[in-house]
Amino acid sequence: MNSNRAAAGPVEENVGTQASVGPCGFVYLYPGDTFPVEEASLLGNLHAGGEVFSLPLLSGLTVEADFHVNVKAVHKKLDPATVSVKASAYHREVIVFANAACFKPIFAGPGLEGLCAASRQLFGYAEFEERAGGAARPFELADLGHLLPGAESHIAGVVVTESFKERLYRGQLVVVESQIQSVRVGECDAFKVPLYDGELFAKSPCRENLRYFYHAGVSRYLFEAHYTSLAQALRVRDVPGLIGALERQSFHDQYKLPKVYECREFPATGHRGAGDCSLTIVDSVATELAVSYGLSFLEVPQEGTALLSYDKWPIFEGCETPEQRVEALTQFNAKQAVHVHSQLFSGNSVLYLARVQKQASNRGGGGENVYNSFFMGHGLACLAEPTQKENGLPSFPGVPASALSGSNYSLHHLAYAASFSPQMLARHCYYLQFAQHQKSSNNSGYNVPTYVGTAANTPMCELCRGSCPASCVNTLFYRLRDRFPPVVASVRRDPYVVTGVAGAYNDLDIAGNFANYRDKDEESNQSEEREKFTYWQVTQTVLERLSEAGICEGGEDVGDAIHNIGSFLKVFKEIDGIVDGEVARFINSMVKNNVNYRESIKSIHHIVQYVCNVYWQPPCPVFLNLYYRCVLAVVQDICLPTCMMYEQENPAVGVSPGEWLKMHYQTLWTNFKNSCIDKGVLTGTEYKVVHKDQFCDFFDVDSAARGEFVSCKTQVRISRALMMAPRVMKIKNRIIFSNSPGTESIQNAFVRGTPKGDSCVVSGPYMRFLSTYHSQLFPGAKISPLFLWHTFSKKRQLPVFPNVPRESVTELANYVEQNSRLHGETSIIDVVPENFYTYAKVRLNNALFRACGQTQFYATTIHCLTPKIQTVPAEEYPHALGARGVADVGEYLGAARELTVPTVQCTSRDNICEVGKCRPIVTLPLVVNKYTGVTGNSQIFQCANLGYFIGRGVDKNLIPDAGSFKKQGVSTSMRKRHVFMTPLSDHLLRRSVQGAAVAFEIEGVRRRVQQILSDGDNPHVIRDVVLQLVKSLGSECRSVSEYDLEYYMGQYYIFAGDVSERLQRLSDLGGDWSEEWALSVLGEEEDPLGGELEFEKVEDAECLGHPQQDEFALAPQAAAPQYSGSSSVAGKKRKANVILGDLDL
């Protein structure tokens, strides 16, 4: 499939081609009196005392409804009639630079600027330097006074394309005031002024009249919040040098040239041998390829999404007042905060990736795959180590040990995670306020009210000087410090945690992508003779049949399904019958389609699709930076084996990385292009951006420089036509334990142990239901369900219930014990069913695994951790008091006693399949494994596998359990994978309900009728069809025509006459058209067996008649004489006997 797509060439019909010619950015002006500042404040990252911050790019909040997210940005004039354009997407942020005081800070704690500046200097990262005064006066809002009176009072923000952020940073974009236009943004009338690159006016004689947009606050924000984060991902401390390299790449199309090697630093322990030299080269090439490919991935045109429509967010439905809208935004911010928590509290966060490392060689030989020898290493301890330039000269002396708290996480590390930006740090702290603290057992002196009333309100605090101890970041850090990871340098190849948004299609059921036939269908366009019965169809059919039986409704239990012991047994026996029947049909379908299911089951996976579209990311600057970091980390991880193999063929001993790159980088760039996309992890498409119109509308440049607008026609030339656009990143989780060499150490976590006989019921699949329906099963019972069934398991004794028949109790106990014991002996799914549908799925998948021969090892299961809001008293959450002062502990407790705060915690009880369909925000650990293809294929492929979180403070659900009724003593965390999920559907997205997805009632009737007809062993099949029609249609059966029966019965329409005859008989008799009435009428007539018919085998019965000889006339020369007498034969002779008549064989 990939080769066919590559042979077809780049796609010309794409979002880049469809983009219109336009400017490089806009300056937006919003009226301060009608702009929703309270709502916008909850979406921004303004810190206390800040003057510049960002808001997300959202139509209805910051841009107009018809804003186009892609543009062919004009940046140069090639000749008087031709302009050069660059196709690009707009940056997801609107940087507000005027009248920021109208907004409320997202975090009230002061001193963030000083903390970030001190941390930046401590870790050796370059500081922002404001541009010296240029020749031209920079643009100011007052310059628009003749066009827009009172422009200085407007809230102003700047929007820029991804390809021209560096030009905005350097103040090289020109404000074309003559093209100001009015737009409707939400409920306010705003204005926007286009920004064009200064190179467009390079030959204009009126250049002195131009107003270049340069705002030191905007440039500082880009430097700290965006470029420093990129520098951390690329292991570069020289941020200005990196910005210059990115400008050369984007503006001058230097994608195939090395650019960043002059800015790079390396550990001071390097350059001592061939191994260290190889590591330095691989590290350098990984950075260069990440800049050339990773950053180009981030600037290509992308498809717009429904997430950008702020005025259509479902969370605002039912909100009648501004306060309710603010509360709705707060609730959603709390839910997405768990993803920021997991990144900050995980020791293997993508924010803490510090260097490229090489695994030590295995002494025993035959170690790990050589392609995985280089890996992305994490560990905050690496930040404190000294570094040097490629020529060996010292660059960074390291962090003094006295400046940090040993191996303890500090505020400086939190500032590093926020890229030393006070705006980003404020947003991080806002999310941390929703986190619940976990007190360490070694921290006996931990007491939040005492800390606020004694230590935090003194001038010793360097940030707030005791003026606002409740909202100070030191107080927040004290409350949560036990959850932060230790500061250590890892030497293992551990996964790293990524955050983004999942795609619409994920294989997250228990058996994952088993029997989906997707790959086979993509490779072959041949139509199948038989309809394939996929695994998804099986689970869907089971759910539908449970719904028809009145047991489930959309995966949720029906409340009145169980009301006594009889109904309890009926429900579970009905579930067992439905599941066992569907499993048998599914297995038979695979046999008919020649599916080798016993082998294919060994390679099934859960699959999560990470969407590589920036407009699918949550509208928050923290998540935007996390998306950039994740893409760059994965691109570097993918390229490591390519760099390693090329360096081995072209060793760099005695040559500096810069000189080596100048000789080999273009070859590496070309090689990586073929090994980056569609090799297992990243899927993407190569765009060819074209402009189909020969001329387009533009304006006269010289007139614009004079402040006039004169329309003209111009030709367009694309500066960079070919673009590689990533689509999704596939993360897989292997379900069946491989038991391959090298996995012996983790085998104990997967091998199935023998369950103890005295705990099979308590740890079995029915205990959840026995506890939930305890009062219905045993009315008036005072004994707890746990004690009742634990006593029964150990002593086989049951109490006497006066209101319950003894026979019913005995039947229930025998059923539960027998099936619990059978489940414990055969189940390889370590999941406790939460509802009837989960019970059915566990039983179904256990049957499938058993049919495929998988009984020895537990299957790996995947669970989602979804956020739940909990309102708690504010006594231990001091930020509820805001920026007010506190004199002592008593005053603090008195002020906090009447307050409550929303907090967030996670639950693992939600159905991951249903959550996965809701476009969730996902946070998960992954490790990229590399391997080669079949013998003779030298291509390197990759696979992103689901990993594990490092750190006990990530979430309490991830702490290894030590339950009383564990099936075995080893940890189950190795076979249980977890993913943090926050659904966007019903929050920021409306559920897409297509017309074809909503079934008509007649479709359900047709399906149920044909299920009955497909059962060839049912002697009452016609009667059951009539009963089903009466049950579904009622009195409408009187008007059922032959055409209706043709639809309902499908291929079984040949029996429609029998069904029509019985319906007519019922119609003639008349009645209430209930199922009981129809059964009473038809039950007496339908008794075909009657105990009188006897069946015998065909070969044992005497053949009473044969075809006439002329029906099988033989050629005259081949005719043979006939003899009397017949002979009974079997097998192949039977056919010949029928054809040749009485011929004696």
Curated annotation (Swiss-Prot):
Family the UniProt entry places it in: Belongs to the herpesviridae major DNA-binding protein family.
Physiological role: Plays several crucial roles in viral infection. Participates in the opening of the viral DNA origin to initiate replication by interacting with the origin-binding protein. May disrupt loops, hairpins and other secondary structures present on ssDNA to reduce and eliminate pausing of viral DNA polymerase at specific sites during elongation. Promotes viral DNA recombination by performing strand-transfer, characterized by the ability to transfer a DNA strand from a linear duplex to a complementary single-stranded DNA circle. Can also catalyze the renaturation of complementary single strands.
Organism classification: Viruses, Duplodnaviria, Heunggongvirae, Peploviricota, Herviviricetes
SUPFAM superfamilies: Viral ssDNA binding protein
One example GO MF annotation: single-stranded DNA binding
Biological-process GO terms, alphabetical: DNA replication
Source organism, top-level taxon: Viruses
Listed name of the protein: Major DNA-binding protein
Subunit structure, interactors included: Homooligomers. Forms double-helical filaments necessary for the formation of replication compartments within the host nucleus. Interacts with the origin-binding protein. Interacts with the helicase primase complex; this interaction stimulates primer synthesis activity of the helicase-primase complex. Interacts with the DNA polymerase. Interacts with the alkaline exonuclease; this interaction increases its nuclease processivity.
Keywords, sorted A to Z: DNA replication, DNA-binding, Host nucleus
Gene Ontology CC: one annotated term: host cell nucleus
Organism: Equine herpesvirus 2 (strain 86/87)
Chain residue ranges for the region called Required for nuclear localization: 1115-1145
UniProt-annotated location(s): Host nucleus
